[in-house]
From Swiss-Prot:
GO MF terms held by the record: ATP binding; protein-exporting ATPase activity
Protein name (database record): Protein translocase subunit SecA 2
Signal peptide: none
Cellular compartment(s): Cell membrane; Cytoplasm
Family, similarity comment: Belongs to the SecA family.
UniProt-listed Pfam families: P-loop_SecA, SecA_DEAD, SecA_PP_bind, SecA_SW
Annotated organism of origin: Streptococcus pneumoniae serotype 4 (strain ATCC BAA-334 / TIGR4)
Cited CDD domains: DEXDc_SecA (cd17928), SF2_C_secA (cd18803)
Record GO cellular component, one term: cell envelope Sec protein transport complex
The keyword Chaperone appears for this protein: no
Record-linked SMART domains: SecA_DEAD, SecA_PP_bind
EC number(s) stated in the UniProt entry for this protein: 7.4.2.8
Function: Part of the Sec protein translocase complex. Interacts with the SecYEG preprotein conducting channel. Has a central role in coupling the hydrolysis of ATP to the transfer of proteins into and across the cell membrane, serving as an ATP-driven molecular motor driving the stepwise translocation of polypeptide chains across the membrane. Plays a role in export of a number of proteins from the cell including glycosylated PsrP and pneumolysin (ply).
């Protein structure tokens, strides 16, 4: 409805619908509870008679608005209704912090639940999902809808498939992005219909949609499978990397996060390792480890990208500052960072299944979402998801004052100036929320505040468990909170008594972040619902975003500069410096968009392959195919292919048969002419028919033959798909590390990925036959099948 329309025109269309909804206020308030609830049945009936969701939007929104008032004591404001309209039409509603996004969602959720195909509300964490489901669930249940939350009370307890099936059959499901992703992957690993629990994806509302679809877009969800043989190269390669010289032995493009070896670097590596050619096939593992080790040293910084906890390395989410406890970098990069830090190496595992959030949410018929910072990324939302971003007016005029940045040459000057600013406002009693870019900087500010005798809280990846409590206290008079960018999205900061009179909450940013959206989120922590407040950023030429994306003269300026008097830090003024910061952040945002676009391009090949594999699995599971017919087709094709191979002797044919078709063949009869493919095929089919007949006779007594066929075929698909997923991840890493080559990496990746997929299909058919014929089966006294596949 709003695709590519201007903001004013979008709002005019929304306000036209709002006017119709407001006209029904009196009518809805006059209905009894029973009459209001009966509207749900009426709406479903109208849909079944041919009306569309759009046809009943006005009346449905008026109904749930009235229900919100009766059950929750909150009547959605006009601006909340406007946000709800935007989301129903599959777009992003940009609503400021404190504008009531949770209540806004009740309207499109209620309306879209009538389809009977399910509505999902996705939040960034389990706490928010449970909280919102409990609060808003009162409204939905009052109106006759069912609601499900796919979490157990005990995190260690695994929910059974039948339990999840009931939950996902609800009209409305509240979940998290990661939980939904892993449920999708696990659903497609089921070996029978009873193990599946998801229905097709219909409509989703994503809370903090930019965080999930943009900031987390490049982190794939992975279900780890069998461990690899652990490489012992990590330590020696890490030592090698410390001897290499940047610019001579390898090239590092920081803004693109690319590294590659030079000819000199390859020679240095060969001398160190005592090999003749690093790029020979037998030395490919050395080359791969070397690229990972350089990336580990140049692209990953301790206490910013990861922390060390005891003898363990844990990744940190750049966008939120939260620990990514269950996430491991793939392909050996994780172990390369561990080797760099000299901590225990975690086991290398193959990925059984993998998907990105981009790919996951594109499966929904309709996506919508809400955030406080979507407009600056509207172009990317349109290009990637075909969603417009509509900025919803605030219910009350914003009173927060956003002051211009203070820019300094060096980091120490900036830290000193920001500390003086903190002391100034702390003395007045204002609560202060100080945002930093890393765990390391949070520790620095904490030690400085401690030295000044200022009591404070620290919120970083090391103590995220206290996030809600710390954030809830940060609006009280005199409170000082030092936080990484994680601080409490989804949790309002309410001002304590007397704080508004002092000017409200003061937000201080101690550096510009890599994305303008994160800076806007930081500012947005202050000034909720018309509260007073202010924000200000302190920036230096040594900050990461400027070092990484600023012009070359910047580096020389802060290197040559000598601080004369730390207590009199020099503020850089003028358009040149103001533009410098803006351009650096713009370049950073652009690099982020490019990286996400590249991730999407790489993922497209995986998506196509995954879709084919999962559809084939489902056809074997759901009973839509006669499995005996499938087996006949597979064996016909297989015997035709393998019989066409040239067998130079009876011994070679015998060896092939006993390793691929049957253990029970003692010899190849003399009358078989091994050079006659028709005779060879006929003999193979005799052996195959005998093997299958014996299994069928045994298993049919217990009605288990079809189950055996299904398990044999699925095992072949799953084993090979695990190898293919792992191969595609290795391939993307390898091609991504060859940036110096003249080839288009995406084209090269697609070609190699397609060739790998074709080879996988051939191997699947061969393994299906081996499983069917050489799998050992037995039936337990309880009538259950036990299989041992080759």
């Amino acid at each position: 409805m709003f695709r590519r329309l201007g903001q004013d025109f979008q709002l005019r269309k929304v306000k036209k619908i709002l006017k119709q909804i407001n006209a029904l206020k009196g009518k809805m308030s006059s209905l009894s509870d029973q009459e209001l609830v009966a509207k749900t049945v009426e709406f479903r009936q109208r849909l079944s008679e041919g009306e569309s969701l759009d046809d009943i939007l006005v009346e449905a929104f008026a109904v749930v608005r009235e229900a919100d008032k009766r059950i929750l004591g909150m009547f959605p404001y006009d601006v909340q209704v406007m946000g709800a309209i935007v989301m129903h039409y599959g777009n992003v509603a940009e609503m400021n912090t404190g504008e009531g996004k949770t209540l806004t969602a009740t309207m499109p959720v209620y309306l879209n639940a009538f389809s009977g195909e399910g509505v999902m509300v996705v939040t960034p964490n389990e706490y928010l999902s449970k909280r919102d489901a409990e609060e808003m669930g009162q409204v939905y249940r009052f109106l006759g809808l069912t609601i499900g939350v796919p979490f157990t009370e005990d995190p260690k307890k695994e929910m059974k498939a039948e339990e999840k099936k009931l939950i996902y059959a609800s009209d409305i499901i509240y979940t998290t992005n990661s939980n939904l992703g892993f449920d999708y992957l696990n659903d497609n690993l089921a070996s029978n219909e009873e193990g599946k629990f998801l229905r097709p994806f219909n409509y989703v509302i994503i809370d903090e949609i930019d965080d999930i679809l943009l900031d987390s877009a490049q982190t794939p969800l992975i279900i780890a499978g069998s461990p690899r043989v652990q490489s012992n190269y990590y330590a020696i390669i890490d030592t090698l990397v410390t001897t290499l010289v940047e610019g001579e032995d390898y090239i590092f493009k920081e803004e693109k996060e690319e590294v590659w070896l030079t000819t000199k670097g390859a020679k240095s590596a060969e001398n160190f390792l005592g090999i003749d050619n690093l790029y020979k096939e037998e030395h490919a593992s050395f080359a791969r480890h070397l690229v990972y080790a350089i990336r580990a040293h140049k692209l990953f910084t301790k206490d910013k990208d990861y922390i060390i906890r005891g003898n363990e390395m844990v990744l940190v989410d750049k966008g939120t500052g939260r620990l990514m406890e269950m996430t491991k970098l793939q392909g050996g990069l994780h172990q390369a960072i561990e080797a760099k830090e000299h901590v225990k190496l975690s086991p290398e595992t193959r990925a059984m299944a993998s998907i990105t959030y981009q790919s996951l949410f594109k499966m929904f018929n309709k996506i919508s979402g809400m955030t406080g910072t979507g407009k600056v990324a509207e172009k990317e939302f349109i290009e990637t998801y075909n969603m417009s971003v509509v900025r919803i007016p605030t219910n009350r005029p914003r009173q927060r004052i956003d002051y211009p940045d203070n820019l300094y040459i060096t980091l120490p000057e900036k830290v000193y100036a920001s500390l003086e600013y903190i002391k100034q406002y702390h003395a007045k009693g204002n609560p202060l929320l100080v945002f930093v870019g890393s765990v390391e900087m949070s520790q620095l500010y904490s030690s400085l505040l401690f030295r000044e005798g200022i009591a404070h809280n620290v919120l970083n990846a090391n103590n995220a468990a206290r996030e809600a409590q710390i954030i809830s206290e940060s609006g009280q008079m005199g409170a000082v909170t030092v936080a990484t960018s994680m601080a409490g999205r989804g949790t309002d900061i309410k001002l304590g008594k007397g704080v508004a009179e002092l000017g409200g909450l003061i937000v201080i940013g101690t550096e510009r972040m890599e994305s303008q959206r994160i800076d806007l989120q930081i500012r947005g922590r202050s000034g909720r619902q018309g509260d007073p407040g202010m924000s200000k950023f302190f920036v230096s030429l040594e900050d990461d975003v400027i070092k990484k994306f600023g012009p070359s003269w910047v580096h020389k300026k802060y290197k040559d500069y000598q601080v004369q008097d730390m207590t009199q830090p020099e503020v850089l003024k003028g358009r040149k410096y103001r533009k410098l910061v803006e351009k650096a952040q713009h370049a950073s945002d652009s690099a982020g968009r490019s990286a996400r676009r590249q991730t999407l391009e790489y993922a497209e090949s995986m998506n196509i392959q995954r879709d084919i594999v999962y559809k084939e699995r489902n056809r074997l599971i759901d009973g839509s195919r006669d499995l005996e017919d499938v087996v006949v087709d597979i064996i016909e094709r297989y015997t035709e292919e393998v019989a066409a191979d040239h067998y130079a002797s009876r011994e070679l044919l015998f060896h092939f048969i006993v390793t691929n078709i049957s253990f029970h063949v003692k010899e190849v009869p003399d009358y078989i002419d091994v050079t006659d493919k028709t005779a060879v095929r006929s003999f193979m089919k005799q052996v195959i028919d005998k093997e299958l007949s014996e299994k069928k006779e045994l298993l049919n007594q217990h009605d288990l033959y079809e189950q055996f066929l299904r398990l044999s075929l699925l095992k072949a698909i799953d084993d090979n798909w695990v190898e293919q997923v792992d191969y595609l991840q290795q391939l993307s890493m390898a091609i991504g590390g060859q940036s110096a080559s003249q080839k288009n990496p995406i084209v090269e990746y697609y070609q190699e990925a397609y060739a790998g997929f074709e080879a996988m299909k051939e191997q699947i058919h061969a393994d299906m036959v081996r499983n069917l014929l050489m799998g050992l089966v037995e039936v337990t006294p309880k009538g259950e099948i036990v299989t041992h596949f080759p």
